[in-house]
């Protein structure tokens, strides 16, 4: 972060907003006509009026081609120029604008001729005029568009290129549709149609290529770079990619009637903060990680906003989001808490109303909090209020206000698509998700910034299929993904993300609502890309509809381009049986390892039930087999909770008309079985009512885990675990089984149901770790559940479709260290418990973890239950394991006592007293790092299997690590020089001449003064009459001297000199001479005073003593977790040989001194400058 001391007042967040946009009386008054406004209007037009004819032609004139002059055309490249900091040369600019003006004039003539011809289509003169106007228009466009692709200016001219390309495609479609009536021969029409299909691909690939080039160009490490990056991404999505996504609809032979598309991509407004665009160094990647990863579309239902307070300032500290699948077709699901649930004020609930949230008016808050005198300043970057406005086509809906309405208006950057109506009706985007950018830098600053995601309004809440149009539905609007199907980032021209499979199986299920009569027949088409030949299968409500063979479209390893995708269809028409149905798409007959991508499906208008007696008999048998006896006293051990749910589904599907009494009786028995299952389950909250709800009980997990309601696989809640990009930050879920629930010398079993998984690691930990990595294929391959079944009359999953019979032999049990094939969705893992001790409370840790990028899992119906008492060999084995564990535990305690004592001595020696509120006068940064490393030599602070779980030594580790943090804070506070280590570049320093801050191989930032005329200085406030120590660590290259001078306005000057000398040089008040640097380096690199130890000093215990849990005969063993030792540790690299540390004492007579750095010749390299107040 940039610690600029001159930042002492709030800078309005919207100072960079469009000055022509005002907020007046709650309405947005638009006084300008920007490229974004034009593009949004055009996108709306293309989405709603994509029908050939005079209406379309005149619509393009009204939106852009009939109203633009040179200044309006110039606004398009200017917009991008400002984003990429590149100015187009005057000649290229003038040429482009001249071409666009010529096209505009010509198209207005074309449009007027088209209008006249459509009014009198048989008039020979008008037909001849249309042939002339088309040829002129096509020739002009063919010539002009390549001139808009000027070398080196492709990016700034991209938005006008796309406008011209869109115009060209529309004209080519006109001739493809109307050419025969204009009098063109069939050969000409076919030739122009071939031009159309070819140019759709060419223009698309060009636009995406240069969009990506520009996006890469604006990326940088700091927050101001990310702001520009996000603005480029957002604005060019609106002005380029959204328009390009509709290019394929110009294919008049594929889309001869009205075609309705949807844009499911999301764009993002900046985290709402004051000073955000330039205050945070190195945070771009952190901010970008806050953006939601590719996902199925969901519908934002509610936001619960929590409030925290910091020194009297209330702010948005965290929030909880609930959402529903598309069409509200499944149970509502909740995302993990973003930020933290502050309790400074009651939570504020923002619930979905009308057509969703179309506008936010936010109030960012920035405060610099002065904590007494000196450098102890805190900065607060938060949001203290937001008004949420709801969209409606008919009436004003009351807004929801969190604390207060602000002035940062989302409509300033994402304006409406129609300015002729109120924004509530003319809005272009609705709020789809909110994440939280959180950062707390100790006592330096606190940052809590909600980040709003916005989705185009064309992405409807439901999948509606009418009768009179071609309906395109992106498959990211699916309700469920088949096992092995993933959502991946779209290639840029699909209007959103796409689905991907690498093995045969179900792709997804899509819930659709039919508004046409059920007699209406359709043909289905699929837009896909594939590296292999394959078969597509479709079904509706579990009923097979189509099956066909299709060819590969791309080579393995090639990038996705427009030509990689193909739209294919089936010849056999079909009709829906229900107004609300489930459409299922699957891919089969290809080898795993190939890639299949699905963009969307299109519905084009064209022109099983067991007998009731058998159902009852089967249900009765299934219920009776749950119990150990006919009196239903106990459950069979091998009856899982998941199986009870499936039997319950079987009973619920019995016919009320035929066997209502028997159905009710069986239902009571199944409920009794479910209660027995709950009673024997030792897990807390097995139904996943929440994660991280309570600190000391229930489930704990990472924030990217989602809880979802029951679907057609799970009757109850289940959890979804996603992959991770960093092994040290895995996706995890864990719970501890308390010692009080366990019986001595007993075997326990963890089991559950996995819908699908890859790289899912399961652990049971007591004396040692039982560990399995589970890869389970999804329901589309082995387990044909009701994923293809229709929904019920109220939108619930129809669980009455046929299932595979439950077979205990398919259970995947991993017992006594045996390896498991994991061909089944059922899993189980055993662990043996020896002697129990309530005081020790060892318990059993249950852990689920994914640490790979491609990993994923969906699981539920988890159970941890008593299996059987231990006897014979099993009893002897657990006693042996317990004894070994206790022996190693005792050894660990002995070794820890020694290491802790040494670490505590190192930490204590940093401070003056046991209150740890004041450092020793000679404590330096290297001593603190050395003590920190000593603290990190304490083993078993956290479990090696999951480093968020405290180990046996967590308390003493965190105690000492807290004091290390205090030492760093105190050390930073007593150095009155700002940015004395140059980690923030030249911030706070005044510079004359040329100097650099470089990062050397040892990852330290150093000041490099390469020229004798250069000077670096800083004015520092001090206390007159007090003593200070000026300490400088530096290195001199070549001849001459490097000097660090301290002085006041008049006299009282002293300096430290550095030279690359051989003979000894002595300076007054200096504690080190030129020939002393070797000794000095020894102090930095490995040895310190008697009150502290350095890095290289040998510890008093062996460095490789084994983990106390390791037991190779009982498990696969446990190894150290390298991520554990990264917790809180500041990697410190000693200085290279050659650097010298010198210091002098200084007694200022006024309240200001100047520190000046310079040299006489050669190069002067400064590592750090410190001015430390002497202790009184």
Swiss-Prot record:
A biological process term (GO) from this entry: sporulation resulting in formation of a cellular spore
InterPro entries cross-referenced by the UniProt entry: Cry1Ac-like_dom-VII, Cry_V, Galactose-bd-like_sf, Pest_crys, Pest_crys_Cry1Aa_dom-IV, Pest_crys_dom-III, Pest_crys_dom_I, Pest_crys_N_sf
Keywords: Sporulation, Toxin, Virulence
UniProt entry tagged with the keyword Electron transport: no
Keyword Cell inner membrane applies: no
Alphabetical list of Pfam families matching this protein: Cry1Ac_D5 (PF17997), Cry1Ac_dom-VII (PF21463), Endotoxin_C (PF03944), Endotoxin_C2 (PF18449), Endotoxin_M (PF00555), Endotoxin_N (PF03945)
Superkingdom of source: Bacteria
Anything else known: Toxic segment of the protein is located in the N-terminus.
Entry's family note: Belongs to the delta endotoxin family.
Protein function: Promotes colloidosmotic lysis by binding to the midgut epithelial cells of many lepidopteran larvae.
Protein's recorded name: Pesticidal crystal protein Cry1Aa
Organism in which the protein naturally occurs: Bacillus thuringiensis subsp. kurstaki
